[in-house]
Amino acid sequence: MNSRQRQLRIKVFFVLILAALITAGSIRPANCASLKFGSPSVSVLASGLQGTLGSTVGPDGALYVVEGTLGQIARVDPRTGKISTFASGLPQTLSSVGIGGPTDVVFVGRTAYVLVTLVSSDLGGNSIDGIYRVDGPNQFTIIADIGQFNLNNPPTIPFPFFVDTGVLYAMQPYRGGFLVTDGHLNRVLSVTLGGKISVVEAFDDIVPTGLTVVLGDIVFMAEAGPVPHLPQNGKIVAFRPNSSNVAEVASGASLLVDVKFGLDGRLYALSQGPGVPGAAPGSPAQPNSGALVRANLDGTFTFLVDNINLPTSLNFIGNTAYIVTLTGDVLKVNDVFHFF
């Protein structure tokens, strides 16, 4: 496929997605008519969180942010920035590893589910890598032991890996269960509420990170790319689970960590920035080099906000973007949306 054909394919793909979202009611033309123009403005909504990676918008409209260091989920009021503890008592980050514990959180209805990683016995821990259902402020039920599944089902595509239980990064609700990315074993898993686990997509060393699901079964996924996280390896791809067709949507931003659709029907992503020269796989990017980017119809990115310090996850509430950083901040970005 030549460059012109590829650009046309991407443009048609975006237009079809947008039309389908409008038809389904996820985006309404009246909402689009009220979108703001202008340069995005950034402020710190909340700070002082510890070990922050994944986040989501809960059924009450608040932000829920994982704190791996503390083994808990924080609730952040998107208007005032007030922080309260939603759930505590989850496995904490192992000091010998430096990352892990709770890494993402989602809601199915009003029930929260937490993705936990790098806490198993192979790394010196005594907990289970997998999905935990929140039954109360400090009560949980493990619904899926993903670490054991990974031990029993190692990757079949050859690439170097050294954590056999995997590094679980992000999850999204999918058909009554979940899709989970493994940024170390380079695959996407399907997990049912009953704990059944299967591999729905397997890749070579592309480092899958954040993902979003639209129209029930179309997955948009961010790729961080292997060390040294070159810009051309930072990509958004799209696929249907269990399909061999994976389409590149956009590329050109280093170490992508999350992807979301905005209210304007455009696709946005977080770039953590260039990797640190000589750093080990899994290391964060260079400080203050992250960016909020928007995917264009020609397969490139437009950089909207730069110099973000180690962003990890992205959510939209109305016309506002909320960015969680590895340093424990929640940033609020106004005036993001533009027509195309």
Regions found by a protein language model. Give the residues of each.
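Bacterial N-terminal signal peptides
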Residues: F13-A24
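Extracellular beta-propeller repeat domains
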Residues: N31-F340
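Bacterial N-terminal signal peptides that target proteins for export
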Residues: N2-F14
